[in-house]
Amino acid sequence: MPSLFTIGGYKVYFWSNENNEPIHVHIAKGKPTPNSTKIWITSKGGCIVANNASHIPINELNEILEIVAAQFFLICAEWRKHFMVSDIQFYC
């Protein structure tokens, strides 16, 4: 599972076996875990919280969402590279 970047101790990463799903990232404090927060990336560069399974406090989660949205192009490029796809499927 490639780590994209770290925000205040939270890792933002992909799970390597989820390329059949629309583009999204996982967020966890410290090392990646199956019980991580999942964020859908929208086609317009926004974010939708699919779940907050890692219980990130809302004020921290909102800051993370802003940074993830600002990294839209990086995340899309890394998704294409990691999953070896040319077209990205978005949640919405």
Q: Which residue stretches match the model-derived regions?
A:
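Acidic, low-complexity intrinsically disordered segments
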Residues: 53-92
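Short, charged/polar N-terminal "headpieces" of proteins
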Residues: 1-23
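A short, structured beta-strand/loop element
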Residues: 17-59
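Short, flexible coil/linker segments at or flanking structured domains
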Residues: 2, 13-15, 27-29, 63, ...
